[in-house]
Amino acid sequence: MDQELERAALVALLRRGDRPWPELTDHIETVGSARDVLEDALDASGQGALFDTEPAADLESVAAEIAAWEREGMRLVTILDDDYPLDLRLVHQRPPFLFLRGTPVSNDLRVAVVGTRAPTPEGIAHARAIAGGLAERGVTVVSGLAAGIDSAAHGTALAVGGRTVAVIGTGLRRSYPAQNAGLQQEIAERGLLISQFWPDAPPSMISFPMRNAVMSGYSLATVVVEAAYRSGARMQARLALEHGRRVFLMRSLMTHEWAREYATRPNTTVIDGPDDVFGELDSLVPATGELTWA
């Protein structure tokens, strides 16, 4: 029950809206207890309770709501839980919680394959070749469930019998774009859906950049297939470099000034095709050897 009440306290703190979520996440991690942080917040405000009842009853009410989410197949993992993804925990933009639907795997090698929603036929072909080859080698293919390159990456990973993870920009109860509802369900059944938003959260202008930050932090590398300057994929490449992760850029991107500039940075590799990514897989595994891939 203690861990359940810790999760409930974290949810209650976030709903209060007293502090920005990143600041609150840092503070909760430092203190080591969301319940202690909540008690301090209530004491400071003189409120004494979350609503109009005793604090313990308040937390039990929120815990019951969390239990209802989990009965619906949405597992809540917080920054205080041991099974919060370690790689994501290390980045500044880590969210205070994740909702998961599907099967988490803690020691898989994860590579994000991302790109434009309006790809060329060549872009689709590259995305399929890269995602399919990664999946066949036992690598988890991560993408954002958007139309275009993302959908091609997810679909191909599933088609070859591999594992794929979708980091989405809405709550888990929503499907965006609507035409990907079937793909979203298949990923939940055969891989994993991740959301950093409340279950009913709609898509928004800020939710997708936030999603890209989580996707970068969750993955050990990002492959950008096709992307314009004003795109989530370009943003994810920038974030991945900030996170100290490897970035692979298709050579066709070198027509863009942003890609040429990124290509000069450490940890960036310009690739001509899938084999250039596959040849770098060993270099993605940390010295601990705790990640596994076939």
Where are these regions (language model features)?
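Glycine-biased, small-residue-rich flexible motifs in mid-sequence functional cores and linkers
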Residues: 1-6, 79-294
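Short, small/acidic-rich helices and loops at N termini and domain boundaries
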Residues: 1-81, 262
